[in-house]
Amino acid sequence: MTLNLRLFLAMRHTLPQNPQFYVTAPQDCPYLDNQVERKLFTALYGTNSRRLNNSLSKQGFRRSQNVLYRPSCANCSACMSARISSSEFKPSKSQKRILSKNSDIVRVVNPPLATDAQYNLFKKYITARHPNGGMSDMDADDFTAMIEETNVESKLIEYYAKKNGELELISFSLVDILDDGISMVYSVFNPYLKERSLGTYMIIDHNRLALEMTLKFVYLGYWVKGSSKMDYKKRFIPLEVFTEDKWICSTKVRQARPNPVNDSKEKLGVPIYLPSDQ
């Protein structure tokens, strides 16, 4: 989360009743070279938080604690929210092998409460995978806030495997339960268990969980065509992305920056539709 959003969270006691939208200052893009990013965001609070989260998640927004945000870059629209249909997704041969390889894993669904085991795994994951990222300096209190500061229906999906006869936490995901799907807010896995392909396994299993809960979609976060950091998401077929105010198949995305936002005409990019009582 950027500093702008952290300050915004600290000021939330002064916020008006109806959702207000703000744009962060530009900063370097973490996905595309020589690009800058900015985010459109609003507070998530009050009695209508769940309805607002449901509505805006369908419009490409993501949650971080009590803030909803989506990219609103001046000259680029490459970042697109991605989701898979739980009923249409069929694991590939390689994904089926990953499922077989991890048949010993135990899934546990818990309330969003932080533990020492989670934090220790989070630090191991960040140090190995994102040592220079924006979360590298998070302490235990920051981690607890990330997990527990939610006023929507959130869960912690934990995965355990036996080590020396005892169950050990090897991955977990903070998720929101939407009216039409599961939104994967943040995922962590043991980076040293590469043979398990835990990142892929977790997405497949979240799809199985969505089917068990009769939910239509699994929301995966953002996807950028051509970004090596995002390539793994296109392996989940069919992948849908939100662009130009609608969900389309990712194979129809022709280039990384299809339509830049024209600030002089439309400050926020595509329209935003709020729940009827907002």
Regions found by a protein language model. Give the residues of each.
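Residue-level preference for non-acidic, small/hydrophobic
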Residues: L56, F122, I203-H206, K233
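A conserved beta-strand-loop-helix scaffold within acyl/acetyltransferase catalytic domains
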Residues: V67-C76, A82-E195, R235
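Conserved acyl-CoA
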Residues: Q59, I204-K216
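Nucleic-acid nuclease catalytic cores
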Residues: I182, Y186, N190-S197, M213-G226
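Conserved acetyl-CoA-binding loop-helix of GNAT-fold acetyltransferases
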Residues: E195-N207
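Terminal substrate-recognition subdomain of acyl/acetyltransferases
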Residues: L3-V106, P111, K216-Q278
